[in-house]
UniProtKB/Swiss-Prot annotation:
Keyword line: Ribonucleoprotein, Ribosomal protein, RNA-binding, rRNA-binding
GO cellular component: cytoplasm; small ribosomal subunit
Protein name as it appears in the record: Small ribosomal subunit protein uS19
Domain of life the protein comes from: Bacteria
Keyword check for RNA-binding: yes
Function: Protein S19 forms a complex with S13 that binds strongly to the 16S ribosomal RNA.
Length: 98
């Protein structure tokens, strides 16, 4: 369920301040953050933010089409290794009829 418009978007204060400082200085550094629930604002566009996925920091380059989404949407927390081998590896499911 989306956040109430009355409250406004949640953006981590320290993260927003670091982005604004970098914008004023014209710097482009990778910022580490644990704030997966922060919403991406237009100030973030063009920066690379390393978002924590529970194990490591995943670098996320923020583009125009990402504004309004949350940082955690772009750093997956689970790795899909595929389903169990079984029938798919053996070469077929049913014998062919003549």
């Amino acid at each position: 369920m989306p956040r109430s418009l009355k409250k406004g978007p949640f953006i981590d204060f320290k993260l927003e301040q670091r982005i604004l400082d970098m914008n004023s200085k014209g710097e482009k550094k990778v910022l580490k953050t644990w704030s997966r629930s922060s919403m991406i604002s237009p100030d973030f566009v063009g920066h690379t933010i390393a978002v924590h996925n529970g194990k490591t920091h995943v670098p996320v380059y923020v583009g125009d089409n990402m504004v309004g989404h949350k940082l955690g949407e772009f750093a997956p927390t689970r790795t899909f290794r595929g389903h169990a081998g079984g029938k798919a590896e053996k070469g077929g499911s049913a014998p062919k009829k003549k």
